[in-house]
Amino acid sequence: MDHIHHLLSSHGFTRTRLAKSKPIVVHAIAGSGKSTVIRKILSDLPNARAYTLGKPDPYSLSNPTIKAFAQFKRGTLDILDEYGQLPFADLDSSFEFIFTDPYQAPTDNLFEPHYTLEITYRFGPNTCNLLNQAFQSNITSLVTQDNISFGSPYLVDPVGTILAFQPDTYLILCLHQAPFFKVSEVIGYQWPTVTLYLACKISEIPEEERHLLFIGLTRHTESLLILGPDAFDSSP
C-alpha cells in the first residue's frame, strides 16, 4: 500500500486532508496520466488487479493490463478506474483504490478524494481555458498548443472523429449518414482531431448532463471543432 501512495505522490498527485480510509479515492482530470500510474502499480505489484468502466487495455501476453469491469473477480489488491460511472450501491467493497475524473461522472456517484490532480498531458491551453470557464475548474496543461474553433453545423463540414451530444444531433447525423459516436460511448478514448455536435449553447446544457459535455470536450489531443446551432453562441 505504501508503494502505491509513493507512486501517486511521485506522479504529481496532491494529497488532501482527508484521513486514509478504504477505498483510497483518486480524482484526476482527463489526460492526467492516471492510467499510466495504474499500469505502473500492476507492473510493480504482482497481486494487484485493475478494472475499468471506461476503455480497457488491449490484451497483452507480456504486460499486466487494465481489464473491463465485466471481468471483475475479487482479489487481494483490487483497483477500479472510472468508478464515477458506477452508482455507490454497485461498488464492490473489495476495491482498495478507486480512480475517476470527477468532471466526467454524475456528482451523485462521487466520493470525497484522498488525492487530486488537475494537470493534463492530453490537450493544450485553449481547451483548458474553455473548460475552466465552463466548469469553474482550475485545469492546467503541459501541452503548449491546441486549437478550438466554432461553427454552424449547416455551414461547416466536420473533421476527424465525430462526436454527438444530445438526441437532436444524433438525428441530424443519422439523416446525413455520417458515422459518429455518442459522447457517453467514448470514456477513455482520444483522437488527434474531433468534431463535437451540440444542440444548444454550452451554458444552456442541464446540470445533470454536464459530465457528458466534459467528456465530449476532452477527447482531442490537437484540434476540436464545436458545431452548434449558433456559431457565435456555442461558447460558454
UniProtKB/Swiss-Prot annotation:
Ranges where the (+)RNA virus helicase ATP-binding domain occurs: 1-117
Domain (+)RNA virus helicase C-terminal: 118-236
Keyword entries, A-Z: Host cytoplasm, Host-virus interaction, Inhibition of host innate immune response by virus, RNA-binding, Suppressor of RNA silencing, Transport, Viral immunoevasion, Viral movement protein
Domain of life of the source: Viruses
InterPro entries cross-referenced by the UniProt entry: (+)RNA_virus_helicase_core_dom (IPR027351), P-loop_NTPase (IPR027417)
TM regions (residue ranges): none
Major place of residence: host cell
Quaternary structure (record): Homodimer and homooligomer. Interacts with capsid protein. Interacts with host AGO1; this interaction targets the host protein for degradation, thereby suppressing the antiviral RNA silencing.
Family according to the record: Belongs to the Tymovirales TGBp1 protein family.
Protein name: Movement and silencing protein TGBp1
